[in-house]
Regions:
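Small-residue-biased structural context
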Residues: 1-152
Length: 152
C-alpha cells in the first residue's frame, strides 16, 4: 500500500551496512540514493517537487557512472542492467512531469516503488558490478563487514 502522507523516520528507507557492496564509488552513490529516497518518503507534499528534481539529477549521474563502467570494462551482463537503469530513469522523469501538474499521489507511489526496488537491484545487479569493478582495480573480490547482521 502506498502512503498518502509522509512516513516517519522509522518507516523510511535508511542507509545501513546491509547495502554495502565493497566498492567505495558504488557504495557512496548508493548511500546518496538511499538518503534521497528516504527524504522523499518523509517529505511534506510541498517539498516533493524540489526533492524529486534533486533525485533526478542524482539518478542521471548515478546511472551514467555505472553505465560508463559497464561499457568501458565490457561487463558481461551490461545490457539488462543498463536497460533497467533506462526504465527507472524514464519512470522518474514521467512522474516528475505529473508531479509538476499537482499529482502528489503518483510521486509517493513512485518513491515507495523505488524504496522496494533498490535493495533487490543492489543485491543482484550492482553487487555483480561491484565485484567486477573491484577485481579490475584490486585483482580480487571485495570483503564486506556488515555490523549487526546475523551470519548464515
Amino acid at each position: 500500500m502506498t502512503p498518502t502522507e509522509p512516513l516517519d523516520a522509522s518507516e523510511s528507507l535508511q542507509w545501513g551496512d546491509q547495502f554495502l557492496l565493497g566498492y567505495t564509488p558504488i557504495d557512496e552513490v548508493h548511500q546518496e540514493f538511499v538518503d534521497l529516497t528516504g527524504q522523499m518518503q518523509r517529505a511534506a507534499d510541498a517539498a516533493l517537487p524540489a526533492l524529486l528534481a534533486e533525485f533526478t539529477v542524482h539518478l542521471k549521474h548515478h546511472f551514467e557512472m555505472e553505465n560508463e563502467w559497464m561499457l568501458s570494462t565490457e561487463f558481461p551482463p551490461r545490457e539488462c542492467h543498463m536497460d533497467e537503469h533506462a526504465a527507472v530513469l524514464q519512470s522518474v522523469q514521467e512522474v516528475q512531469a505529473l508531479l509538476a501538474q499537482g499529482n502528489v499521489a503518483i510521486c509517493r507511489d513512485l518513491v515507495e516503488h523505488l524504496a522496494q526496488w533498490f535493495p533487490q537491484h543492489a543485491d543482484q545487479l550492482d553487487s555483480a558490478l561491484a565485484h567486477w569493478m573491484f577485481s579490475r582495480t584490486m585483482g580480487g573480490k571485495p570483503v564486506v563487514l556488515r555490523r549487526g547482521l546475523s551470519l548464515r
